[in-house]
Swiss-Prot record:
It holds the Pfam family Proton_antipo_N. It is found in: Cell membrane. This is Putative antiporter subunit mnhA2. Its main location: membrane. Belongs to the CPA3 antiporters (TC 2.A.63) subunit A family. It comes from Staphylococcus epidermidis (strain ATCC 35984 / DSM 28319 / BCRC 17069 / CCUG 31568 / BM 3577 / RP62A). NCBIfam families: PRK12646.1. One of its GO terms (molecular function) is antiporter activity. It is a multi-pass membrane protein. One of its GO terms (biological process) is monoatomic ion transport. GO terms for cellular component: plasma membrane. InterPro entries: CPA3_Na-H_Antiporter_A (IPR050616), MrpA_C/MbhD (IPR025383), MrpA_C/MbhE (IPR046806), ND/Mrp_TM (IPR001750), Proton_antipo_N (IPR001516). May form a heterooligomeric complex that consists of seven subunits: mnhA2, mnhB2, mnhC2, mnhD2, mnhE2, mnhF2 and mnhG2. It comes from the Bacteria.
Length: 800
């Protein structure tokens, strides 16, 4: 149950932060209260490292909807532990950084940290979920919380557009992911991820295997900003920098990669998956690194660099996916090397990219700009950030003595050995190496170019709006700590490799500790080999390009004619146009029109059900005994109902409608149900009175003459609806699928202590229904109250 308690702790902290919203003095400490959640979460995961290394996994399963195998199924293994550590430890730094970044006087701190806590809670849920539907719920929660965080400064138009764009693309991917999970359930009959992976060989032979893979890939590519779905990530940079440092470099964008790692033992059985992921990753890596060079905004450079680095990791996920087809032959060592390298670089990227974002945030916060055309010579003002960002950028570029060099070497080693695989010949291997090396050169170029344009050159204070610029040490602390980790990981890589990456590799492989024999030992020096030569080539050419070429002009000419963002905007505008037309066609302010649409949909669903399972048998209908009173009431009700179709006077219609309600009251009396009769009488009386009282507030609408065609159509609709309801009564009488609950009602007094069966039903047997019905009424009341207050502030308006 420890995982449940962990999630509950995060929710509790969220509630405490929510409480600070109503207290002005407490708002200032909302960030420090929120900091408790990542500290507790990271402490928990660190304490579980020894257990996971010994293959002692933590699992919790609580029934939710067991009939369709949807349960609160949580599991902590090596892969979820690694991602959990990244989410929580980076979270500690980002939460603290955010307390210094946001203004205590102008920013709504509790609201921001509630959103951030919701996101962290959702990400933890994704990585420990062992049920596909539960994972999907958390998956969409990350999209919702990301939308809220990107639009935090909602008065900014860029924030609004970025939030909508990211939400639409990631939710589209989420729906595709859900489709893939449903296909998996159709194939296997289970939603439990471990059970699904155990059936991987049977699943791979199913005709729906490839469609399922494509759906999961859509979910992963949209979430992890892979080409051509990458366009949401640069627009998301309108969010506060702590959001960019956390969501868009270290956590949310890694969710798609986590998904593919989790299902690698299954997905890797298909060459379609291997080719698609590998080449989409390479294209994304190349496109992102090239596009980063045409940016003026520091966060824009980092956004495209993140896209490029995600493409690099995705390439390794694709190359290593073939392990599912070679779990015990001579190629196993290569596949495990690639998967290990992908996990290693994922960790390294979280460290150096988060440090870069924090550095950019400090520069922007203190100087008021992120434009590299204005930021020359900033090393004189931000000496600590100069060192932090220089080391982080060089690590991203793959320079020796920094952690990025180790994983970049492993990446290049993987590319050079691709020709040993069954899926790749000499030509494909040459293409893969060429794209990988070119993208690596461009990565080195934009990394050094960013540092050169920001920190080197002549400093001119007149370019800045703020004339007093300083570098707060407390603000810089999280970035400095991350910077120190960069060389530490390089010099002691196997500490992280053995305690974090090895258990994750076991989980990805699907065979546990048996994979240990193939896991590489991370070394800083492998001798002079092809990957080292390629690294030297990357550094030399990258230095020349970064210091000599004017990349703004070059890449602007290359990319300006192929803007995917313009295509997205055109599609979005068309979507808005057709949506507006559809809304205008449906929402014509005529209540009877709305009711007919609702009834039509209801009848269509019922008819579809009958066509699918068959129509009810009329000869099996059981008709209860009835007397003269029931006959009279039925005839009176029928006459009143038909009259309502033709009558135009409001008062008469309300009175007749009330008479139908009173007739129902008499029905209840005839059936010896006095409580229901009394309730119906009171409700009907109050409703009728409220209708009549409201007449004085209603506008004068000209009386419309009766139209024979319209009235005939209304009668037909009424008859069809009546026949549908009667047919459902037939079905209810003939249904025998579920056990009777009459025994509960017979024992109502003993079970509930209630002498009134209706009270027992509402207060005990269906207590949750009653509670949620009351909650719906409360929410509706709050909505009406809000609208009335809004009207009072805006003034009286006849349309309102």
């Amino acid at each position: 149950m420890s995982l449940v308690y962990l999630m509950a702790t995060n929710l509790l902290v969220m509630l405490i932060v929510l409480f600070t919203l109503s207290h002005r003095q407490l708002r200032k400490v909302a960030g420090y209260v929120a900091l408790i959640a990542p500290i507790v979460t990271s402490t928990y995961f660190i304490m579980k490292i020894p257990d996971v290394i010994r293959n002692k996994f933590i699992a919790v399963r609580l029934p939710w909807m067991p009939s369709i195998d949807i349960n609160l199924d949580l599991r902590l293994d090596g892969l979820s532990l690694m991602f959990g550590l990244i989410i929580s430890l980076i979270g500690v730094g980002v939460f603290f950084y955010a307390t210094q970044y946001l203004s205590h006087s102008t920013d709504n701190l509790p609201r921001f940290f509630i959103y951030l806590l919701l996101f962290m809670f959702s990400m933890i849920g994704i990585v420990i979920a062992n049920n596909t539907i539960l994972m999907y719920v958390f998956w969409e929660l990350t999209s919702i919380s990301s939308f809220l965080l990107i639009s935090y400064w909602y008065n900014n138009g860029e924030s609004q557009l970025g939030a909508i764009q990211s939400f639409m693309i990631t939710v589209f991917g989420g729906l595709a992911l859900l489709t893939g999970f449903i296909i998996l359930y159709i194939i296997t009959g289970t939603n439990t991820i471990t059970d699904i992976l155990n059936q991987r060989n049977a699943i791979s032979r199913h005709p729906l295997f490839i469609p399922m893979i494509l759906m999961l890939l859509l979910g992963a590519f949209t979430k992890s900003a892979q080409f051509p779905f990458h366009i949401w990530l640069p627009k998301a940079m309108a969010a506060p920098t702590p959001v960019s440092a956390y969501l868009h470099s270290a956590t949310m964008v890694k969710a798609g990669i986590f998904l593919l790692f989790r299902f690698t033992p299954l997905l890797g059985l298909s060459n379609v998956y291997i080719y698609t992921v590998t080449f989409v990753g390479l294209i994304t890596m190349l496109f992102g690194s090239l596009t980063a060079l045409r940016q003026y905004d520091l966060k824009g450079i980092l956004a495209y660099s993140t896209i490029s680095q995600l493409g690099m990791i995705m390439t390794m996920v694709g190359l290593g996916g073939g392990y599912a087809q070679h779990t015990s032959d001579e190629l196993s060592k290569f596949y495990i090397l690639v998967l290990f390298a992908g996990l290693f670089h994922l960790m390294n990227h979280a460290v150096f990219k988060c440090a870069l974002f924090m550095g950019v945030g400090i520069i922007d916060h203190e100087s008021g700009t992120r434009d590299i055309r204005l930021l020359n010579g900033m090393r004189k003002v931000f000496p600590k950030m100069h060192i932090v960002m220089l080391l982080a950028a060089l690590s991203m570029a793959g320079v020796p003595f920094l952690n990025g060099f180790l994983s970049k070497e492993m990446f290049l080693d993987s590319l050079t050995k691709a020709n040993e695989l069954d899926q790749y010949g000499f030509v494909l291997t040459f293409v893969i190496i060429s794209i990988g090396v070119i993208a690596s050169i461009l990565t080195f170029t934009y990394a050094l170019y960013m540092i050169k344009e920001t920190f080197w050159g002549n400093y001119n204070i007149e370019k800045f709006k703020r004339k007093q610029i300083h570098e707060p040490w407390l603000f810089s602390l999280p970035a400095v700590i991350l910077m120190l980790l960069i060389p530490v990981i390089f010099f002691v890589p196997n500490v992280f490799g053995n305690f974090v990456i090895l258990p994750a590799t076991r989980s990805v492989s699907g065979i546990g500790a048996e994979v240990d024999a193939f896991v590489p030992h991370i070394s800083q020096w492998h001798g002079v080999n092809l990957p080292l030569i390629l690294s030297i080539v990357v550094i030399i050419i990258g230095l020349i390009l970064a210091l000599v070429v004017n990349w703004k002009e070059v890449t602007h000419q290359i990319i300006k004619s192929a803007s995917i963002t313009d295509g997205y905007r055109k599609i979005y505008r068309e979507f808005e146009l057709y949506s507006a037309r559809g809304i205008r066609a449906l929402m014509n302010n005529k209540l009877n029109y709305y009711i007919m649409i609702t009834l039509f949909i209801f009848v269509a669903i019922v008819v579809y059900g009958y066509l699918t399972v068959g129509f009810p048998h009329v000869h099996q209908l059981h008709i209860s005994s009835f007397g003269p009173l029931e006959v009279i009431l039925s005839v009176v009700t029928l006459i009143i109902g038909i009259s309502l179709i033709f009558i135009r006077q409001r008062l008469t219609m309300v009175v007749l409608n009330g008479m139908i309600g009173f007739a129902v009251t008499l029905y209840f009396i005839a059936m010896k149900a006095p409580d229901l009769a009394l309730t119906q009488l009171v409700v009907e009386t109050i409703t009728t009175i409220l209708f009549i009282v409201s007449f004085s507030r209603l506008p004068n609408i000209p009386r419309v003459k009766a139209n024979l065609k319209k009235e005939t159509f209304k009668i037909i609709v009424s008859l069809v609806m009546a026949l549908t309801v009667v047919s459902l009564i037939f079905v209810a009488q003939q249904a025998d699928g579920m056990p009777s609950i009459a025994k509960f009602y017979e024992d109502a007094y003993e079970l509930t202590g209630g002498k009134n069966i209706v009270n027992a039903i509402l207060g005990d047997f269906r207590a949750l229904d009653t509670m949620f019905e009351g909650l719906v009424l409360i929410i509706a009341g709050l909505g009406i109250y809000t609208l009335l207050n809004y009207k009072d502030r805006r003034g009286q308006d006849e349309r309102e």
